[in-house]
Regions:
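A short acidic, amphipathic alpha-helical/loop segment
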Residues: 33-37, 102-107, 130-133
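Conserved P-loop NTPase "ATPase switch" module shared by AAA+ and STAND
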Residues: 80-100, 117-119
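Substrate-engagement module of ASCE P-loop NTPases
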Residues: 100-127
Length: 144
């Protein structure tokens, strides 16, 4: 499934709007595709972590978390939002440049504890063996 045609809003669209927590660098390849898909899908609100300041069209609906994104800050956002439905990791290599599997395992634990869906994007041209070990930790993966 192509991400641009995918429904990124997780959960029942007829219920209250959902919050999606995005983790990643907005300058990473294809992140614009992800943001455009969210805009088309009509998601009214989501959090966004980036190493820079995003000032695109969706800046009024994206809350920029601190640049030093930690699992603790992710856990706080998850704990503070009852209508959070899932976490989307934009480009796992950019979001976790050290490919630290233990960090992603802890993120997976946060999602399981809160009954959240964990999905990510990966790039077809940059698949590495470490990516395949990470793949089993996600509920869904979109290859761009």
């Amino acid at each position: 499934m192509k991400l641009s045609k995918a429904k990124l809003l997780i959960g029942d669209k007829s219920s209250e709007s959902k919050i999606i927590l995005l983790i990643g660098d907005y300058e990473a390849p294809k992140t614009e595709v992800v943001l455009d898909a969210i805009k088309k899908d009509g998601s009214s609100y989501c959090y966004f972590y980036t190493e820079g300041v995003y000032d695109g069209e969706l800046s009024d609906t994206l809350t920029n978390l601190d640049a030093d994104c930690t699992l603790q800050s992710i856990n706080e956002v998850v704990s503070d939002n009852d209508n959070l439905e899932g976490i989307l990791v934009v480009d796992s290599l950019s979001a976790f440049p050290d490919n630290n599997i233990s960090r992603i395992r802890r993120l997976t634990t946060i999602c399981r504890d809160k009954d959240l869906t964990l999905i990510c994007t990966m790039h077809k041209g940059r698949i590495t063996p470490i990516d395949t070990s990470l793949a089993v930790l996600f509920d869904a993966i979109y290859y761009l």
